[in-house]
Amino acid sequence: MNSQQNKLPQQPQQPPSSIVDDDNWKSQLKLPPRDERRQTEDVTATEGNDFDDLHLKRDLLRGIFEKGYVKPSPIQEKAIPIALAGRDIMARAKNGTGKTASFLIPALEKTDPTKDVIQVLILVPTRELALQTSQVCKELGKYMNVQVMASTGGTSLKDDIMRLYNPVHILVATPGRVLDLAQKNVANLSNCHTMIMDEADKLLSQEFQPLVEQLINFLPQQRQILLFSATFPVTVKSFKEHYLQQAFEINLMEELTLKGVTQYYAFVEERQKIHCLNTLFSKLQINQSIIFCNSVNRVELLAKKITELGYSCFFIHAKMVQAHRNRVFHDFRNGACRNLVSSDLFTRGIDIQDVNVVINFDFPKHSETYLHRIGRSGRFGHLGLAINLITYEDRFSLYKIEQELGTEIKPIPPVIDKSLYAA
């Protein structure tokens, strides 16, 4: 890296925190404690590049290292240079392997904070993911003066309109809300040359695709589109052919499930499930767990039962008031509670590092749902456990999901080795 190019100009108004000495800037970083947990090849099988090799702005590197990132993961190593070169990307990588940073880092690098226009639009399918992504973006860009805004349905439209009177450089949003703002001429996307779609398979489902296609009409002709997902159904491929220019394809999905997640099933009758769950709670070394149910009603009933058994428990689902959902998400992430009962609202992209156990209280019908659920444990190459409670009616779904994902879900042993999932 050319050290002359990287030196910041010495100007009298430069705040003292701007580090000018090339040899000295790393020694002044405020690094978090090093995570010494063992990691799997999902994040360690790289070509050996460092973040320093990516020719990023000094202030962005400071944010990256202070966030605790040490070296780029495989998806980051592949995607960041291509995104910085301005190519469209269609990237497929497992959940929990660093996808978010692989698009946030180039987004921040390419943003010019001196221009008071929206330059990057990041679309996500859920409100929780929008809040999480915008928070990570703010943390990575904390020295860059880049203004990041999250905008989602379920919150005050008036507040969003007021916020957009001030500069916003990167907008993280759900499709319906940002389309509403664009149609009202409040969110001006005419200078937004980069659109990123996280969880692209969900964004291109029947629910969202018409909104996404309308949004593209508000973008300039010269634009870059980045698609990131763990699964790429036919809808994504046809969207790519229609809207992406000579997209660079990245596929890090030789196998679909995370290497660090051990999967078990237990055959139970419906009426035995609570008893089985109680046994698991007493025997497992749980840091934090997420327990999935197939309906909103069952989420609330199960959370009540778990609390009656004497275990700390929150619940979250799509029919809750947004402010309540935000509070549950925030408190659970901060470790206020050990167990969270959830509907499939909470399967996509949500990153809580302390979750080491996922329990499918109700087994899902589709392999895609299963994949996203178990990806809540074993985040960023760490170890995790997925336990599936299987009724007689679920046996065909179990077989189908094993076949479709090419994975093995084993019968649960009498004792589970703690080294498989506990740091």
From Swiss-Prot:
Residues 260-420 form the Helicase C-terminal domain. SUPFAM superfamilies: P-loop containing nucleoside triphosphate hydrolases (SSF52540). CDD domains: DEADc_DDX6 (cd17940), SF2_C_DEAD (cd18787). Its EC number is 3.6.4.13. Pfam families: DEAD, Helicase_C. It catalyses: ATP + H2O = ADP + phosphate + H(+). One of its GO terms (molecular function) is mRNA binding. Its main location: cytoplasm. A motif (DEAD box) lies at residues 198-201. One of its GO terms (biological process) is negative regulation of translation. Keywords: ATP-binding, Cytoplasm, Helicase, Hydrolase, mRNA processing, Nucleotide-binding, Nucleus, RNA-binding. It comes from the Eukaryota. It is found in: Cytoplasm, P-body; Cytoplasm; Nucleus. Residues 80-250 form the Helicase ATP-binding domain. GO terms for cellular component: cytoplasmic stress granule; nucleus; P-body. Residues 1-46 are annotated as: Disordered. ATP binds at residues 93-100. Residues 32-41 have a biased composition (Basic and acidic residues). A motif (Q motif) lies at residues 49-77. The Q motif is unique to and characteristic of the DEAD box family of RNA helicases and controls ATP binding and hydrolysis. Belongs to the DEAD box helicase family. DDX6/DHH1 subfamily. ATP-dependent RNA helicase which may be involved in mRNA turnover. This is Probable ATP-dependent RNA helicase ddx6. It comes from Dictyostelium discoideum. The lineage of its organism: Eukaryota, Amoebozoa, Evosea, Eumycetozoa, Dictyostelia. The gene is ddx6.
